[in-house]
Amino acid sequence: MGDQLRVVVMNSFNHDYASAFRTSLARLGLQAEVIDLPNIELADLTPGKVRHIRHLLTPSAPEQIVIFCPGIMEMFIDGPHHSVHFSVYRAWHDEGASSVLPHPWSVHAAPPRAAIAWTEKPALRAGFMGSIYDDAALVRLGRRLPRPIKRWLLTGRYLRHARMTACAYASGLPVRFALAFPRVEALEALERQAADQDDFDVRIIGTGGFTGLPDAKARYVDEMIASTYVLCPRGSENFSFRVYEAFLYGRVPVIIDTDMVLPSQIPWRDLALIIPYDGLDGVAQSIRDDYERTDAARFIARQRAALDLMQELGTGYWLDEALGGIVRMRRAARETTSACRLRPLSI
């Protein structure tokens, strides 16, 4: 492909996504111009930065294929390029223009299996450790809104206008956590509903942020291992690192579905518990139902499958498939367009 393929990748403060893309492109035998963008904090996003990224996403020649990965940032820019995201909204996801990727990278190391393996049915225990966002002004506002307005907001439609979002940040509006209210609602609902169930242990630990210091990481891992079910409601983006960390430790992620598009490489119904946002009134019962219908053998098998999954995702095969598929699709579309232009008119 030579200079016909350009990949624009935005890294995060924890993860070097550009290196993963370069490795995958090399495995595929694809030559590409990889533009490695530094991490941009949402609070630092400006209209000028959006214009710069939009310029990079403009093909320099008609035959050039451009792929954009904004990292964990929910940046959606329309154009002739193809985007790959970790966070997408079902209401307006276009499979022909964007792809959804898993996020198997973690700051936490994979543990020895023997240290986390279940040998019998675990206790009915659900946990969460992390930022709760209950003190964010827009989260407090979001919780008070009527349910129909909440549902509309959770489709993330306003995020389709990257320049408008950048203007909001540049003007000082604290919009980063505007859609984080389901996290507070889910955690409070579970605590409230399980309060009178003596055999249901719920541990919700708010940290106010993740420092990355050794003690904080060790405590997070300890809480993860102590849990059977791990609450994974969305935060500032419409996905959660915690889902993959739960798989990494062989635990069962409880996903609150807020119009999410989940990566197709994962057998979600087999390995996770998915509860619709409108089902929060029964979140504790949903977890209990899953627990009661799952015997020891099934818990052990599900754990083994989750650990195997993370090993498979660690090979990066899914990124090879995604990039290869995008290139093939774009080539086919270009060839179809060329054929239509060359086809003689029948009179």
Where are these regions (language model features)?
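Conserved donor-binding/catalytic loop of nucleotide-activated donor transferases
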Residues: A226-S227, F247-R251
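"Short basic amphipathic alpha-helical interaction patches in structured regions
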Residues: L141-R143, Y244-E245, I275, R288
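C-terminal "capping" alpha-helix adjacent to the active site of nucleotide-linked donor transferases
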Residues: L273-A297
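Short, hinge-like loop/turn segments at secondary-structure boundaries
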Residues: G250, L271-I274
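Short C-terminal alpha-helical element
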Residues: A296-M310
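Short hydrophobic beta-strand element within catalytic cores of glycosyltransferases
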Residues: V252-I256
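Nucleotide-sugar donor-binding catalytic core of glycosyltransferases
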Residues: G2-F239, D257-D270, F299, E312-E321, ...
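Short alpha-helical segment that forms part of, or immediately flanks, the ligand-binding pocket
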Residues: V221, Y244-L248
